[in-house]
Amino acid sequence: MTNSLKIIFLCTFLFSSTTNFLQSKPFESTYEPLPAEKILITNASIYDGDGNEYKNTDVLVQDGKIVAIGEDLPAPEDFRIIDATGKWVTPGIIDIHSHMGVYPAPGVRTSSDGNEATSPVTADVWAEHSMWVQDPQYALALTGGVTAFHVLPGSANLIGGRGVTVKNLQRTTINSMKFPDAPHSLKMACGENPKRVYGNRGQAPSTRMGNAAGYRKSWIQAEGYLRKLVEYEEKSDEAKELEYAPRRDLEMETLAGVLKGEILVHNHCYRADEMATMIDIAKEFNYKITAFHHGVEAYKIADLLADNGICGALWADWWGFKHEAYDMVQANIAIVDQARNGTGCAIVHSDDAIGIQHLNQEASKSLAAGRRAGFDISEARAMKWITSNPAKAAGIYDQTGSLQVGKNADIVVWSKNPF
């Protein structure tokens, strides 16, 4: 082989390899379901996760899927029968805001890996690369009916990195826990945390206006990066052979994924005015916020959230632990839910390894507070706050989050009404 041919071969290899990198999706889920049982659940009271309640209803499960729901379903000979008389059946609970795995138990510094607090923007880090697969908290969450959860980086940074949705089962690798085909998320944070962390070091951001500038600078960079990618991909094969593909940038890849609609934005934010600012920034750069997390003041802008299709992922009654968390009302979740004639999206989240064990009770507290405030909300609707709504916010509603024929049999049988 002549030197010129070697050079041509090498350049062609580099061009094709770089392009493949840009199109690759590393760390794919390798989840394999447990051996499936054939099960018929009979005579159950059901909250289906889509706002409906049924009595004396059967659920037929085969090959890990729901295959039939109805009254008096015939019992196939080789099916295990679970008599749910006096019991309740719901979809598996989903926690949209968890730090299990990245802050595992016991809580020691050597395995506390949720915040890469070395730069205000760390879009290049992925929470799944910090998760400890042996965290004993997973099993405790399972006793509370949690079948899937969404793990986020912490809130020290303006842009903290990618989140991941996982099945609640213990495996030896994180890829084998990852929920198949679930999109990545991007954790963003506004308010006190980023400006405190970096302001205390004498660097930006140290103010809320510094926060806003930091987001905007990052999105401007991401727009430029994405523009270069698009321009390169639109070139002819002959033109591509004459120049290098844009250099990979892990931080920009994540932000470009948001701009392309492939990565879902989950935004830590407490104050109503800051949530409104974040909505304005999202519109400036043409990306969508999927959910605001914590949102103690979400009730003030509930209609704005509904108008923009943004969920409020909220606590039932945790407030007052810092200044931006003071102005809370216990009907917060109910107000977000009932915005714009009931078109709002409310989610009860935990952010806590104890709270994740009791999300049904947290939802019950929120339901009671809403009723005291005068809202006529059914228990069947409140079940959406911990099932179908978080499933939608995690991008997995097509697979789980409600009891529908064809969906995964992520099912909880409760000894009593979960509320």
Model-derived features with residue positions:
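Bacterial N-terminal signal peptides
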Residues: 8-20
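Histidine-rich, glycine-flanked metal-binding segment
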Residues: 26-37, 46, 50-90
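Active-site environment of divalent metal-dependent phosphoester hydrolases
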Residues: 100-103, 133, 156-159, 272-276, ...
